[in-house]
Amino acid sequence: DSVMPFINHTPNEKGVYVLNRTSNPGGKDLQNLQVTDNEKRFPLYMEVARGIVNYNAGSGSVGAVVGATNIAELKDIAAFYADKSIPLLIPGVGSQGGTATEVLSVLRSVGYPVELARVNSSSSLTHPWKKAPVPEDWLERCEANLRSMIEDTKV
């Protein structure tokens, strides 16, 4: 009843992304809670991943949001999805600390089809000077970060 209304009202050739494991530090408070299934213990985010696979099986239009800031968790989730055609939206690259190079390396290492991944790096592209005053060369910095991101994510 929380995801299906979105899936049911998604037009053809469109999709929805479900939060699987977020990149914010507080995400671990809930998403890393241990759940048990047939005496096996695993983090809640892996149970969410199983749910995403089930939702996608019915519609083919469900992806997962998995942050780039905890590379070990991204690796576990990507390995689980590697043969299931689940698109990944991966925020947390750039200002939050993840790198596109590391993300793509991890995806490739577990056999995840990188063409299904969308690596997001908005803050480091739109205002790479962090919280400092806007520099005179702000446009050049934005362009340089964009070029770097494109280079880092070439398939």
List the model feature ranges, each with a label:
Residues 7-11, 53-56, 77-82, 150, ...:
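Surface-exposed amphipathic alpha-helices with a cationic face
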Residues 1-65:
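Conserved anion-binding
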Residues 10-14, 35-40, 83-86, 107-110, ...:
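Short, low-complexity, polar/charged sequence segments that are solvent-exposed and flexible
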Residues 103-112, 116, 125-155:
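C-terminal helical cap(s) of enzyme catalytic domains, especially alpha/beta-barrels
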Residues 3-7, 49, 74-75, 100, ...:
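Generic structural signal for well-ordered alpha-helices
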Residues 29-31, 76, 131:
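Short acidic, glycine/serine/threonine-rich loops at helix termini
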Residues 69-120, 124, 128:
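A C-terminal functional module that forms or caps the active site or interfaces directly
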Residues 39-46, 71, 97, 136-143, ...:
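Electropositive phosphate-/nucleotide-binding environments in soluble metabolic enzymes
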